[in-house]
């Protein structure tokens, strides 16, 4: 494992922990898109169905378990534990426009036409756009809480570091995964505007709000 992947995993884990702490400490999921969190739960479930059949390392297995457990815990808190605080009126993105195309694409473009490989490919495609409901929600409300901004920034950093991970692997290992790289680029591009607002506002102590 290279440094970029390790730091990317840490950033991803930090994002998940920030979100869980935000919801638990405030006893509220206001400003959080339940739809994005459901999509992430689907992503991790589809990607890590090989948990019991493909052992790589203790680190890899532990991270898989943590991602799955945390994603479903987040969904549970939003739709059950703190559902009274869930802002469904603003969480209105049509997720079928993300799930259906990525599922079809996974069947058409994959590395190997087997159930686990298709599910893995589907998870890669879906993860690249799973944050859209959250970004759409922020655009509808016009602002985001600081902790939510930190969560989104950490997710963006995770994807950016993973792009460097692919570059590193290609240069030093000759490994090239076009599906993962293209999906990672798409996901990183989606964060670009948010990165700018985060750097120019949140890091200066201001609340993240969209231009009128």
Swiss-Prot record:
Cytoplasmic side: 25-32, 80-92, 136-149, 200-212
Topological relation to the membrane, as annotated: Multi-pass membrane protein
Annotated GO MF terms: KDEL sequence binding
InterPro entries: ER_ret_rcpt (IPR000133)
Region (Important for recycling of cargo proteins with the sequence motif K-D-E-L from the Golgi to the endoplasmic reticulum): 204-207
GO CC annotation, single: COPI-coated vesicle membrane
Positions of transmembrane segments: 5-24, 33-52, 59-79, 93-110, 117-135, 150-168, 179-199
Region: Interaction with the K-D-E-L motif on target proteins, residue numbers: 47-48, 159-169
UniProt-listed GO biological process terms: protein retention in ER lumen; protein transport; retrograde vesicle-mediated transport, Golgi to endoplasmic reticulum; T cell apoptotic process; T cell differentiation
Main location: Golgi
Keywords attached to this entry: Cytoplasmic vesicle, Endoplasmic reticulum, ER-Golgi transport, Golgi apparatus, Membrane, Phosphoprotein, Protein transport, Receptor, Transmembrane, Transmembrane helix, Transport
Post-translational modification: Phosphorylation by PKA at Ser-209 is required for endoplasmic reticulum retention function.
Location of the protein in the cell: Golgi apparatus membrane; Cytoplasmic vesicle, COPI-coated vesicle membrane; Endoplasmic reticulum membrane; Endoplasmic reticulum-Golgi intermediate compartment membrane
Site (Interaction with the K-D-E-L motif on target proteins): 5, 117
Pfam families found in the cross-reference section: ER_lumen_recept
Residues marked Important for recycling of cargo proteins with the sequence motif K-D-E-L from the Golgi to the endoplasmic reticulum (site): 193
Superkingdom of source: Eukaryota
Residue list for modification Phosphoserine: 209
Topological domains, Lumenal: 1-4, 53-58, 111-116, 169-178
Family listed: Belongs to the ERD2 family.
Quaternary structure and interacting proteins, as annotated: Upon ligand binding the receptor oligomerizes and interacts with components of the transport machinery such as ARFGAP1 and ARF1.
Function: Receptor for the C-terminal sequence motif K-D-E-L that is present on endoplasmic reticulum resident proteins and that mediates their recycling from the Golgi back to the endoplasmic reticulum.
Protein name: ER lumen protein-retaining receptor 1
Species of provenance: Mus musculus (Mouse)
Lineage: Eukaryota, Metazoa, Chordata, Craniata, Vertebrata
């Amino acid at each position: 494992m290279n440094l970029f992947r390790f730091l990317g995993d840490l950033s991803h884990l930090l994002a998940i922990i920030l979100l869980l702490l935000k919801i638990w400490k405030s006893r509220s999921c206001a400003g959080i898109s339940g739809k994005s969190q459901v999509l992430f739960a689907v992503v991790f479930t589809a990607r890590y169905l090989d948990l019991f059949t493909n052992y790589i390392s203790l680190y890899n297995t532990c991270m898989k378990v943590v991602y799955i457990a945390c994603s479903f815990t987040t969904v549970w808190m939003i739709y059950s534990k703190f559902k009274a605080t869930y802002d469904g009126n603003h969480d209105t993105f049509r997720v079928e426009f993300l799930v259906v195309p990525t599922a079809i694409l996974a069947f058409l473009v994959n590395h190997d036409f087997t159930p686990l490989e298709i599910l893995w490919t589907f998870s890669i495609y879906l993860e690249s756009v799973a944050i859209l409901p959250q970004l759409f929600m922020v655009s509808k409300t016009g602002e985001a809480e600081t902790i939510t901004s930190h969560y989104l920034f950490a997710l963006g950093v995770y994807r950016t570091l993973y792009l460097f991970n692919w570059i590193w692997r290609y240069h030093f290992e000759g490994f090239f995964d076009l599906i993962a790289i293209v999906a990672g680029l798409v996901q990183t591009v989606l964060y670009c505007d948010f990165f700018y607002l985060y750097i120019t506002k949140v890091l200066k102590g201001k609340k993240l709000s969209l231009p009128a």
